[in-house]
């Protein structure tokens, strides 16, 4: 949909086109994270219990209990942990906060598709780096690029959609 009200970043976006959606009865579509099994009895019991424990109220907007638990678990100070309303919000804040718009952002050419969307929304130019023949991120390709010439690097680990992880030593 076009509008004179869209920003340049939004006007340049293309609608998401889902992958093939076969219309075969009882087919489990793993590409859309469907599961052939029903929830376990323990999951159903946990859902029922949660429904009776204030689920109708908004949660703590600062997620203080979760933030403290994550900080404690990872041996960090609370100020070193960021909690958001899902990965979309966290990624949007990261793109807005960390990437200088005058420089390109590096990312794998095959990766999580929304990285490019966030970059477009925030006016950040993207520069893709090809995966190697085995569909693996080669960190040497990134190390060969002058760090001062880019806004940063964004890499999903494990990579989406290939599922290949980079070792902590390589990161």
Can you describe what each PLM-predicted range is?
Residues 55-171:
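Conserved core of the PLP fold type I
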């Amino acid at each position: 949909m076009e509008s004179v009200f869209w920003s340049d970043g939004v006007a340049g976006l293309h609608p998401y086109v889902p992958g093939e959606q076969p219309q075969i009865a009882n087919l489990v579509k793993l590409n859309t994270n469907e599961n052939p099994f029903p929830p376990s009895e323990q999951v159903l019991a946990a859902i029922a219990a949660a429904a009776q424990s204030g689920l109708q109220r908004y949660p703590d907007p600062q997620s203080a209990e979760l933030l403290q638990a994550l900080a404690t678990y990872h041996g960090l100070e609370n100020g070193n942990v960021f909690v958001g309303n899902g990965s979309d919000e966290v990624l949007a804040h990261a793109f807005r906060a960390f990437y200088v718009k005058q420089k390109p952002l590096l990312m794998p050419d095959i990766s999580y598709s929304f990285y490019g969307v966030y970059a477009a929304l925030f006016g950040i130019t993207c520069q893709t780096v090809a995966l190697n023949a085995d569909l693996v991120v080669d960190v040497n390709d990134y190390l060969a690029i002058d760090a001062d010439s880019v806004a940063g690097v964004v890499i999903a680990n494990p990579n989406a959609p290939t599922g290949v992880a980079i070792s902590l030593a390589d990161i």
